[in-house]
């Protein structure tokens, strides 16, 4: 009995010696009896074990009586799926001048081993404001840095890879959704079982801004003196300086949305109040309007909006 073998190539994690781990068994398909009708070999009994060589061919030299049998893979290399198919074959009576018969199970076609494959899926969300994030692009890499694929999240913040061969990988963000900070972390995962699905939840921090508002005005700083025929004349001198005591309100000038599409502030809505000369709290990206609420003492309120 001889066979041919096909082993699916694993280009990401090659193993040229995979054939060395493969073992096949020959089993009886029915009870095998002696000339007296006594069962000598019960049905499904293992009769021989053999492997294949570097040409991916194998053969059994077991001296089997005329009967029905099947071939079954007992062991394959790590990273490949065991073929549990039973391949039937038979030895039948031949002319008396034929001493040995060679059969080829599976019609002489190669018996295949596929690589173990699994998947990785991601869910991407906004760590700052909540909500799913679309258009996050992640690369899938083997531990030696070879890119094995990529993922791009949809409007639900989701994507799933194509089949990945058994092995260790990591995810790394290539492009962050608009309005968020690129995540520099690597997220390792391992595919170890056939059709396994690894789920990874990922987040981005939204970009934010701060506003520093300073107020300048003229204050009396000195006086120039000059002699006149009527006495000393004083001319006030004014200098520009930063003024304290102003208070400002910051409004949304347009509807402001988070990167995940959540409405944070409607147009005209007050976001925060800040004192002049102080840095504002973190503000979401968007168009704002600054309006003076309280003028410094001794100055007229500035009613102009600053966009």
Name the predicted role of every residue range.
Residues 1-307:
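Solvent-exposed loop/turn and edge beta-strand elements of beta-rich ligand-binding domains
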């Amino acid at each position: 009995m001889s066979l041919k073998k096909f082993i699916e190539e694993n280009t990401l994690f090659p193993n040229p010696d995979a054939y060395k781990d493969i073992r096949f068994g020959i089993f009886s398909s029915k009870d095998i009896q002696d000339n007296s009708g006594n069962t000598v070999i019960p049905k499904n009994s293992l009769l021989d074990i053999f492997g294949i060589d570097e040409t991916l061919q194998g053969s059994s030299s077991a001296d089997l009586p005329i009967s029905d049998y099947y071939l079954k893979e007992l062991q394959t290399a790590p990273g490949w799926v065991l073929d549990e198919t039973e391949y039937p074959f038979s030895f039948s009576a031949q002319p008396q001048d034929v001493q040995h018969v060679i059969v080829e199970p599976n019609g002489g076609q190669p018996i295949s081993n596929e690589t173990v494959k699994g998947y990785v899926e991601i869910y991407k969300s906004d760590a700052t404001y909540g909500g799913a994030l679309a258009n996050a692009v992640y690369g899938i890499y083997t531990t030696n840095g070879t890119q094995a694929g990529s993922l791009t999240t949809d409007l639900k913040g989701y994507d799933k890879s194509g089949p990945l061969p058994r092995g260790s990988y990591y995810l790394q963000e290539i492009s962050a959704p608009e309005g968020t900070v690129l995540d520099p972390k690597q997220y390792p995962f391992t595919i170890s079982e056939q059709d396994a699905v690894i789920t990874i939840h990922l987040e981005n921090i939204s970009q934010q801004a701060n506003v520093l508002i300073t107020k300048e005005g003229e204050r009396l700083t000195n006086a120039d003196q000059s002699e006149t025929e009527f006495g000393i004349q004083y001319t006030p001198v004014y200098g520009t300086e930063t003024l304290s005591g102003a208070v400002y309100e910051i409004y949304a000038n347009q509807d402001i949305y988070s990167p995940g599409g959540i409405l944070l502030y409607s147009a005209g809505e007050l976001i925060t109040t800040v004192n002049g000369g102080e840095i504002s709290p973190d503000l979401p990206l968007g168009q704002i309007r600054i309006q003076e609420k309280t003028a410094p003492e001794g100055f007229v309120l500035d009613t102009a909006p600053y966009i």
